[in-house]
A protein has these predicted regions:
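Glycine-rich beta-strand-turn "strand-cap" elements at beta-sheet edges
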Residues: 2, 39-50, 76-99
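Short, well-ordered beta-strand segments in beta-rich or mixed alpha/beta enzyme
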Residues: 2-9, 39-69
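Short, surface-exposed ligand-recognition loops at beta-strand->loop->(often short) alpha-helix junctions
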Residues: 10-18
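An amphipathic, aromatic/His-enriched active-site/gating alpha helix that lines ligand/cofactor pockets
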Residues: 24-36, 57-92
Length: 99
């Protein structure tokens, strides 16, 4: 299992536009082989650099890479998303703790 973490710099006043675009991408990705789960986080601080942080789990690195295909690239080319800076990277768990 791998985790894609993507932080988004969304300009003030563009949150709803961004989130509408994100929902389209999420619907597309959820149908992809190897998709496990997704959580989109929104900062409680309105002046945070990264207003949104997306955490997506995939069965494997290969599944994640295969899902980022031409259809995905077409969706993220829409102005609501293409004008937003993002920092995607894949991560593996190196430590986990629970209460």
């Amino acid at each position: 299992m791998v985790t894609l973490i993507n932080c988004f710099e969304v300009p003030a006043g563009r949150e709803e536009e961004f989130f509408a675009g994100y929902r389209k991408v999420n619907a597309y990705m959820r149908a992809k082989k190897g998709y496990v789960s997704n959580k989109m986080h929104r900062s409680l601080a309105r002046d945070a650099t990264f207003r949104f942080v997306n955490v997506v789990q995939w069965e494997s690195r290969e599944a994640c890479e295969a899902a980022h295909d031409a259809g995905f690239r077409e969706l993220i080319a829409q102005p609501a998303l293409s004008s937003v800076r993002s920092t995607p990277a894949l991560y593996e768990v190196v430590h986990e703790a629970t209460a």
